[in-house]
């Protein structure tokens, strides 16, 4: 494109290809544009729940706002977990929401000194080894909800085994909430 000086429209169903090759990507849903944006914005700042679910991997919870302070909300999931999350807009108490969180936003055995983290225990269900794309498949105790967590291949987590109970956490700025 840059060498020829021409704009191209390329249609693909391969998300990775679209994100790597494009200056702008259009995400369509049932023949309508959901979001037209840079690959970085589609991934990091989806504007609709459809785009959040469609582009990349996500962990998702449904729940409601139980408390708000400016643009910070306390969310309770349907499973009873409580998280703090930064909102783009203030939502009143009782608002039903969907919360999305990327697997790479979750920290394994986070530093206890990090005060802005949502922390909770999980049980390792599977270790999905795929080199740099490795993941942990985990469940919160007494829950069948499956969560994916990026597993860095820096040897720091080689001790983790299936059935281990570990603590995970994520920064309150990492979650993306949408009113349902």
Language-model-derived ranges and their functions:
Residues 58, 68-180:
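Non-catalytic connector elements of ABC transporters
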Residues 2, 7, 12-81:
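Internal alpha/beta loop-helix hairpins
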């Amino acid at each position: 494109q840059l060498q020829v000086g021409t704009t191209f429209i390329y249609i693909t169903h391969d998300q990775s290809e679209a994100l790597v090759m494009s200056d702008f990507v259009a995400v369509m849903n049932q023949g309508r544009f959901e979001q037209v944006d840079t690959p970085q914005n589609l991934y990091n700042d989806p504007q609709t729940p459809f785009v959040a679910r469609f582009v990349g991997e996500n962990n998702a919870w449904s729940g409601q706002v139980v408390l708000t302070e400016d643009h910070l909300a306390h969310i309770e999931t349907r499973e009873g977990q409580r998280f703090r999350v930064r909102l783009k807009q203030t939502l009143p108490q009782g608002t039903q929401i969907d919360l999305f969180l990327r697997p790479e936003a979750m920290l394994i055995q986070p530093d206890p000194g990090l005060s802005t983290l949502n922390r909770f225990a999980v049980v390792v269900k599977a270790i999905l080894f795929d080199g740099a794309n490795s993941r942990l498949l985990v469940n919160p105790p007494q829950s069948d909800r499956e969560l994916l967590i990026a597993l860095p291949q820096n040897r720091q987590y080689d001790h983790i085994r299936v059935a281990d109970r570990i603590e995970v956490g994520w920064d309150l700025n990492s979650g993306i909430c949408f009113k349902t």
